[in-house]
From Swiss-Prot:
Subunit structure: Under iron-starvation forms a complex with PSI trimers, where the trimer is surrounded by a ring composed of 18 IsiA subunits. When the PSI subunits PsaF and PsaJ are missing the ring is composed of 17 IsiA subunits, indicating that each IsiA subunit has a different interaction with the trimer. This suggests that the size of the PSI complex determines the number of IsiA units in the surrounding ring. In the absence of PsaL has a tendency to form incomplete rings with PSI monomers, suggesting PsaL helps form the rings.
Cofactor note: Binds 16 chlorophyll a molecules per subunit. Binds 2 beta-carotene molecules per subunit.
Role according to the record: Functions as an antenna for photosystem I (PSI) under iron-limiting conditions, when phycobilisomes disappear. In the (PSI)3(Isi3)18 complex most of the harvested energy is probably used by PSI; in other PSI-containing supercomplexes a large part of the energy will probably not be used for light harvesting, but rather is dissipated to protect the organism from light damage.
Keyword set includes Transmembrane helix: yes
Species, as recorded: Synechocystis sp. (strain ATCC 27184 / PCC 6803 / Kazusa)
GO cellular component: photosystem I; plasma membrane; plasma membrane-derived thylakoid membrane
Gene name, Swiss-Prot/TrEMBL: isiA
Name of protein: Iron stress-induced chlorophyll-binding protein
Any one Gene Ontology molecular-function term assigned to this protein's record: chlorophyll binding
UniProt induction comment: By iron stress, salt stress and to a lesser extent by heat shock.
Membrane-traversing stretches: 25-45, 89-109, 138-158, 208-228, 240-260, 303-323
Domain of life: Bacteria
Amino acid sequence: MQTYGNDTVQYEWWAGNARFADQSGLFIAAHVAQAALTAFWAGAFTLFEISRFDPTQAMGDQGLILLPHLATLGWGVGDGGQIVDTYPYFVIGSIHLIASAVLGAGALFHTLRAPADLSTLKGQGKKFHFTWENPQQLGIILGHHLLFLGAGALLLAGKAMYWGGLYDATTQTVRLVSQPTLDPLVIYGYQTHFASISSLEDLVGGHIFVGFLLIGGGIWHILVPPLGWAKKVLLFSGEAILSYSLGGIALAGFVAAYFCAVNTLAYPPEFYGPPLAIKLGIFPYFADTVELPMHAHTSRAWLANAHFFLAFFFLQGHLWHALRALGFDFKRVEQAFDSLQT
């Protein structure tokens, strides 16, 4: 991380992963622990939403944020978008809780038993040691991340085509997608109007296209070191890599916010409520187009606005760490204001 020439910087507990930036083993332990927390939240909150779910009311009117995603995947849904069985949701929530325990055990193992520095290992584990100034090793780690993302996209396509299908809001049924769109021109054509997609075949085809693209990119980054032009354009440091990651998450968050707000195929009104209106007050926000009792909000409103504001703050983090990576010292701003006061 950026230390401005001070090699004796001490990070407190609240600094998070910055404490382990130069300890590859503990860095992995922290990531596994964070995955455990994420899985625990997903499992626990799924079970909480099941306890609050009222089948006599529309799902989108109940402020739920996890069950609508599971319903969109076709689990427990009958014709017309009616929820007929919540047991699959209980199973999925329980699996996430079990997975969180396994991941938590892995985090403890990497913290207590595995070396803090993977360079001291022998065998295959040593290849996952990294330093921020080593572009080739960072490329290998990036490649493995892309492989998992690609596998996730293809798993969704597999669920749509072979393992039960997805909920189709246009027919209000759960169906298999036997002929996904594989024409790259059609898929790439959505670049300018992606939020208007209304065909489940196109949606699944897009996941297949992106899945193979990610896997191809993952293999490339594992086998091929960063090219010369990339080394000249990009900064390779912990601060810079963090800024790139935050920028990517911010972009994904803004896209997801708008897509969730207006699209009714990936986010069926039966589960999320009707599309939202884009409003501008002190800041932009997405507003419900229906009035619910007690001034409640639809699931779509919660998700779209949460994604927007989280993306906004991720963007601020991207700019902060990008400037630090370039060498800008924010303490100089404070010093400048202090000099004005004196």
